[in-house]
Amino acid sequence: VDVPPLCNFILPAIVRTGPLAVAISTAGASPALAKRMKREIAELFGEPYANLAVILNEVRGWAKATLPTYQDRRQFFESIVGGDPDPIELLRTGRVAAVRELIEDAMRAYAPVA
């Protein structure tokens, strides 16, 4: 029974796309608003973001094995995510190979010199 005064928990609206999940809550104030926000967030952060998450996950092992510190790994991934060209825009236009090239360039730039 949905009787807010008798409830002691609230379920968020959740947007799931690939490995991404975004939870939205209005603390029970407005399920209709949460539904609208869920729809808008799904449109804004859809497939390109999920695809980038999958691609970045593919290089996590390399980063952990190659880059010695958390700071090094953070800089590496931030250089890709905030890179120029923007990987999200590349994915929105179907240019997956260009994103992979961007990542390969970052791997070469951040790999320790042997």
Where do the language-model regions lie?
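An accessory alpha-helical subdomain
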Residues: 28-114
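Rossmann-fold NAD(P)-binding glycine/threonine-rich loop
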Residues: 1-26, 33
